[in-house]
Amino acid sequence: MSKQLLALNIDGALLRSNGKIHQATKDAIEYVKKKGIYVTLVTNRHFRSAQKIAKSLKLDAKLITHSGAYIAEKIDAPFFEKRISDDHTFNIVQVLESYQCNIRLLHEKYSIGNKKKVNSNLLGKALIHPSDPIFYPVQFVESLSDLLMDEPVSAPVIEVYTEHDIQHDITETITKAFPAVDVIRVNDEKLNIVPKGVSKEAGLALVASELGLSMDDVVAIGHQYDDLPMIELAGLGVAMGNAVPEIKRKADWVTRSNDEQGVAYMMKEYFRMQQRKGFLDKFHMKRV
């Protein structure tokens, strides 16, 4: 069965370890676009960051950003958005400030984080986002809750950078205290707190539906824990060679790693036999 929508994770899939996209990957994306495949990005990143990458790939698509909480082609005209209320954002931050963690409120137009002292590796991941565009303000403050008292924020996503051994405690505490949100494990050092029902897979299903497609028509490529549900739901779920073992076990296809152009390899191998939809319709042929 042919696929008509290709959903790509950014970090660990599109991007190599050096943070760059290989020319082979760009060429492969252009190749599948010429076959009539709708290509989009599915990411935890904020919209501005995903938009910058989409532009470099010449993608005109609804981008699934903020873990599925913000879907748009243009920042001021979202197709879908869902936020944590400013009251809940404030209260959740108060709870998180009792833990040894870095907090980042990821709005589509700016981000605000705290300066909590954690190990240098975690701090670097919370502070350094090399793809943040210059027009995306990033602010760090001593007390996030103090700032929110004066300047309320309704955040699509609250990022939490912390040690793996306290992730479960944070997840349990937030889930019990705030039923209006979900806590998603991204990797061993990061949790995302999102509005209830928000996820990458839910966002991808929305975009597919808007295109008149089902999840059976989708190829989804990812590598970390929060990619697993969309990989399982997609018609073809693909794990990167650098993916966590659980995703590799459950994927339909394991491609090469991000440093071995795994995305480009998979696209060329899978889509090379698939004809453009309009070509097949012209001759009343079934796609294979």
Swiss-Prot record:
The keyword Metal-binding does not apply. It comes from the Bacteria. Pfam families: Hydrolase_3. Disulfide bonds: none annotated. GO terms for cellular component: cytosol. It comes from Bacillus subtilis (strain 168). The gene is yhaX. Keywords: Stress response. Induction: By phosphate starvation, via the PhoP/PhoR two-component regulatory system. The keyword Iron does not apply. This is Stress response protein YhaX. InterPro entries: Cof (IPR000150), HAD-like_sf (IPR036412), HAD-SF_hydro_IIB (IPR006379), HAD_sf (IPR023214). SUPFAM superfamilies: HAD-like (SSF56784). One of its GO terms (molecular function) is phosphatase activity.
